[in-house]
Amino acid sequence: MSRFARLLLIVALFFTNAWAKTVKETLRITWKEGAPNGQARELIYTNGQFPSPTLVWDEDDDIEVTVYNEMAKNVTVHWHGLDQKDTPWSDGTPGLSQRPIQPGNKFVYRFKASPPGNHWYHSHEKMSLVDGLYGAIHIRPKGDRTGLWSQISQDKDDIKAMENAAYDPEYLVVSDWSQYTSEEYWKISTDSGLLVFCLDSILVNGKGEVYCPGQKFLQAELAPGLVEDAFPPGTEVSDKGCFPADLDQVQGGPWNITKRPDLIPPRVQEGCVASRHENATIVVDPSKNNGWVSMHFVAAATTAQITFSVDSHEFWLYEIDGNYVNPRKFVSAVMSAGETFSVMIKLDQEPGKYTMRIPNSGASQVLGGFAEMVYKGCEREEKAGKAYLSYGGNPTSPDVEKNSFFPWQLDTDHMSPWPPNKPRPGNADEEHLLVLGRVGAPYNYTMNTKYLYPVDFQNDDPLLFYPNATRDTENDGLVLRTKNGSWVDLILQVSTLPGDTASFEHFMHKHGSKTWRIGFGTGVWNYTSVEEAIQERPQDFNLETPGLRDTWITAFSIGGEAYWSVFRYFVDNPGPWLFHCHIELHLMGGMGIAILDGVDAWPEHIPEEYQLR
């Protein structure tokens, strides 16, 4: 080899290694008392803080995270939105990729920082997301995004400024919060025989308050038409904004169980006790980045469907679930639990304090949440600005509604991928019909007609290591198998199971790959193939510009109308991946299924350190 060639090789290796660096992180998980909304309870702290620390990496970094479990209960950590290509043992899902991390033990997760974008991490052991183990992840991209920013502004200075703003964004981890721990909360439902989902606060970056504006105010904040369309005439919410727990429309049925609403403790459904604490403050600097600021929102909610807006400020939505989308301008946007959004805001208003309104906009509860966006130097100013959302998440005018993002169906969700990325047209290679709903009790949820996914499913014998463990058993109804290199359609049907005709939304998340939502419609799925459905109902499908995400919302069924959705993906990441509802109560109640992608190319060379012992 010539001296010149040797020099080129050294330079190439240097730059490759300089970019793909190894990053080591340590997470120490502890359990102690805290009061993020001013009311004390026990919760999870990570490295002594709540929520968990934000992790910032560069695309293709080699990541090594050592998790020490210093609690008296099991834990795992799931890296939500990361594809875990060739590292399925680091997905963090008990029973699929690992055994739970027991008290006093540690686990080392190793994976590539991929794909770039806005993601998050959280506990995946039982319902412990309710207890506070969650934090933001930002993977800074290698590639040039000029084509993305030029859709917002053609000005070269703006384009450069937006790139800089996106490189160093503000992070807003939005969560819902209860006065009860996850174990206590679940026990309330099983003891009473009623699904209970009333909360106390919306937190932003671990800060919030308990608001008690009064029952009449909350009743007036109900979404227009909600009671008339979905509940008996005269239905009223409590002084916490919650619907009566024993409503048939809420609980479904009839079920062969005893309902004991008297076993619901005080202050769960009603008996609001206010507490003043503090809300998060986001300080922004209009003198930086030509007045542009990027904000990364993480919906770390367990039940709530979050809406957000900033008084007097429009924003450009440019990324969903770590995927860039062709930017669109809105004044408010709805996020389901599990999703991540990135927005770009121009700081072009009078310097001052502006309220960020972040309420629960779902039909589960009228619950407000707030933060403040403060122009640098205006910390002592009075609040200013025009509100786009009310306390309960209702648009303040018809114009606001027209300029808001609603993700429930094809005709309102036009956030197509950037750069263009579409699925194969026509038929997929495999189709799987999954019927979602409740079976046997208000808190029992299925993804496959009748099968309930246990919280300890395969915990001792994870399917990564024992992929055939469920064959010839009833538990095989909890497993789907696909072939590597195939296109797969997942057809989700809601509101057809007996007793569950009035179905609330489900926030469906697939590990290991993102999916395109190519179809959505009303009625019962009775087609022999997706291709047949496309031919009969072309208006209900989009294979040219469908959205690409890892978390999708199903429809809220009012009056027992059935709905279906079709999600398509390509199998190129063999491993055991959980597909589940991201509402913690629903997953705890059984709404999950294991998808063994690429069973014909199953990982054979699992590193020694991950082998079961």
Swiss-Prot record:
Put simply, this protein is called: Laccase 1
What species is given as this protein's source? Metarhizium robertsii (strain ARSEF 23 / ATCC MYA-3075) (Metarhizium anisopliae (strain ARSEF 23))
Q: Which UniProt keywords apply?
A: Copper, Glycoprotein, Metal-binding, Oxidoreductase, Repeat, Signal
Its UniProt pathway annotation is: Pigment biosynthesis
Q: Which positions are annotated as binding Cu cation 1? A: 78, 509
Plastocyanin-like domain location is 29-142, 171-359, 468-598
What does the UniProt cofactor note say?
Binds 4 Cu cations per monomer.
Gene coding for it? Mlac1
The principal localisation class reads other
Among the Pfam families in the record, one is: Cu-oxidase
